[in-house]
């Protein structure tokens, strides 16, 4: 099926709460565990683009107490929930939250040792926005670790994934999940994007619905 761009970012309070209360612990912990295993000494100054309710960055901060993380999201409702979660975890000194969109967030060029993102790319109407920002804000040889949904072959395939993964979740979350699957890119499309952006990253499917884009920027 062709890509169907999502109607809006998750800035509705009901959507944000449904997403924050959903159980993404398995995929979020997988992401953190593999990031740390793949790049154990490269995580010092980290940025998470599209941080959502901050579950990933909280898990990373607990795993790597020496890391400082700048976490960015464009949805005010999501940043509010992220702030509550970071405060409850006692990690305010380790995690800085910023509400804003890319491009536009005032981040200095070549600032970060590692650039992370999980389940954010598919929200963007133009994916090159993300790849250009990655090149701009990463230091030479910075780690890039991005995990996102990939688009199923048909809408029916997307519905099967929704029912398998989110059968017990709220209807609003299931609708958002279906829309996200339809808005996601295929691994081949992402490879084309990376070539256009001159980014030397690899793309690998890691589950029935997720792909992992990883590597380092040029030194």
Language model regions located:
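A conserved beta-strand element that flanks and buttresses the S-adenosyl-L-methionine
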Residues: 116
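Class I SAM-dependent methyltransferase SAM/SAH-binding core
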Residues: 47, 55-104
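Conserved glycine-rich SAM-binding loop
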Residues: 52
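Conserved beta-strand signature within the Rossmann-like core of class I S-adenosyl-L-methionine
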Residues: 141-148
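A short glycine-rich, Lys/Arg-flanked "PGG" loop and its adjoining helix->strand segment in the class I
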Residues: 129-140
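C-terminal alpha-helical "lid/dimerization" subdomain adjacent to the S-adenosyl-L-methionine
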Residues: 149-198, 203-205
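Conserved alpha-helix/loop element of class I SAM-dependent methyltransferases that forms part
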Residues: 25-44
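N-terminal, positively charged/glycine-rich alpha-helical extensions of SAM-dependent methyltransferases
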Residues: 1-18
